[in-house]
Amino acid sequence: LDEDGVDAFIIADYGLISMLSGKLKNAEIHASTLLGVYNIETVRILKSYGVKRIIFYANLYLDEMIRIINTFPELDYELVAEGGTCFNDIRQCRLPHIISENEHILTCRSGCVLFDQEDTPQKGKMIAEHPCRVAEVVGIYMAAGIRSFKIEGRTVPAKERVSHIRDLKNYIEQFSNG
């Protein structure tokens, strides 16, 4: 694939990164979110293997990303901006997914009905507020040094995915044009 013009490999395995280190002629190695890049030492190791881009997962706080970017400004940084995340995992859920034996929340943004001890339905309420979309604050991430944004689409209907892409593109252009 390297000889066929592939420009980058997004890799989620340290062993494979180590094996490819220094062997690619054209393609770059990009560190997948699945590697769990959460601190400066991890980035230091990945850089020593020749990784050129770090793809941040949205569960890092902005100040954590900035610390890494400021330590290694020569690397490229990317953020998963939409989709592919569990809001419980990125610190936006207010309750666990399973409330009781009788109640299971399919998504964190779903409404639910709570039951009292006699299994009588109580007032329904939202478990979590709709989270802020990265598109709405993309300028903050761009100012921090993140220049690329991914939109995961496997779990989002096409119609919704298209609107996410359009929104993200518009916000990036607004920030870029001042």
Regions found by a protein language model. Give the residues of each.
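Residues lining hydrophobic/aromatic ligand-binding pockets adjacent to catalytic sites
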Residues: 51
